[in-house]
Every structure is written in C-alpha cells, then in structure tokens.
C-alpha cells in the first residue's frame, strides 16, 4: 500500500494519520473501522467475486466504500496498519459452533499487531459483535471492553481431543489461543503467521458451501457511535443499544431497504440483495 492509498483509507474511516505506531493510535483506528466499514456478506448473494489480494480488497473497501467478511476486512485493515508502521501478522482461526465444535481450518482471519513499545495485540474488525478495541495477547486475565468481558487463554483439547498446538515455529511457545467473550469461547487462533493467500480456501468454502451460514443468510452490520450496533439482516433492521436492548423493524418497500443500505451503511446496491439460491448463476 502506497502513501496515497493509506491516506485514502484513513479518510474512509475518518481517522488522522498517526505519527507513531502506538497502542493509542491502534485503538482509535480499530474503533473507527468498526463504526464506518460494515461487516457484510452481500458479495456472496450479488454474485460478486471475492479475491484475497491487497489491491482488490482496497478497491472494494476504500474505492467502492463497501464492507466485507473477516478475510476482506482484516486483510485490508492489516495492510493499512503495515503501511502505518505497525508489525502485522495474519492469524488463522476456527470459530466455535454448536456443542463447542470448531469450524473448518482457515475459518477466520484475525491480526496480531505489534506496537512501538513491543506489545502484541489482537486486532479483529471482521467478527461482527466483538471487542471494540484490540485485546492484549499477553494478558491471561479478564479484559473489560465495551463489547463485553474478554479473555485470551492458551487452548486445551477441543471436543474431538485435538490439543491446542500450532506446530513448530509458532509464537507463544506453540500454543493455540482461545478467545472468550463473557465466558463463552468465540474462536481458536493458531499463533503461526500466515499469508493472505492461505485463506483462499476458507473464503471459497464460506462463499459457496450450503453449510456456511454466510450462504444461507444476508447480513450488513456496523458499530454505532454510542457503542450499540445496527444490523440489516435481509429486510429486518435491528438496532441494538449499548445495554443490549434490541428494537427491530421491517421496511415495507424495496426503496426503503435500499435507503437503509445507503444512509446507514454507505452501500448503494442496484437492487435489494436477496439470499442466493444454491445453483443460481449470476
């Protein structure tokens, strides 16, 4: 990413260029990204190709002012942070599902970010409702955040009996890490750094498999200025207050749905997105 691209990205999220890669600047960038770049899976249902290459991600997030899912959002954010002087590594995660079962390999992409003081942080702007600020990767106690109470712990065996190790060459002694929110496991991270291209298979699976929740539903969601959340799921708009109270409404017309995409998320689809049926082309 060149300086002009970085400046355009910073304008996209309404942030000033930090003078140094500090944790304070990282917190501000993380929060502004969550407020301005929506977590959304519209490309899957609009028949748009998802390509995990830096230039393509920048074109989508910055040039076309869209959002994306974890691979796109954290991939693009990681490129920005690198351009701003942070040391960034891509980490592969597996999301916890029903009965504590872990998802597929490369199920999730998150970032390990090293700040100027040498501290390592977990930055994740691509997991929907999650921490508003980066989490310390060195801290094993509770970390209080507007998004909940989080813990980062060394992983034990999963329900299948697989131990939480990432293999030779991994950081943190080779141990996988579990990320918990309000006492419940969210995802498991390998600590071995990966390349963006490594996540191509995971992105393809989530974009095509009938078992992926991304192919079965529509979502467009962002953090609000007051710390709540605004989510458009198909035609249902849910407003979540900072205290967790929810209000829902369903627009009556296509024009109202398109206006919500435009006014609340900055997205201008030509038609109202609908869940793409299996085998449907174009």
Question: Residues of each region from the PLM?
Answer:
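His-Asp-centered catalytic microenvironments across diverse enzyme cores
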Residues: 1-13, 17, 38, 95-242, ...
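Extended, charged low-complexity segments
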Residues: 235-282
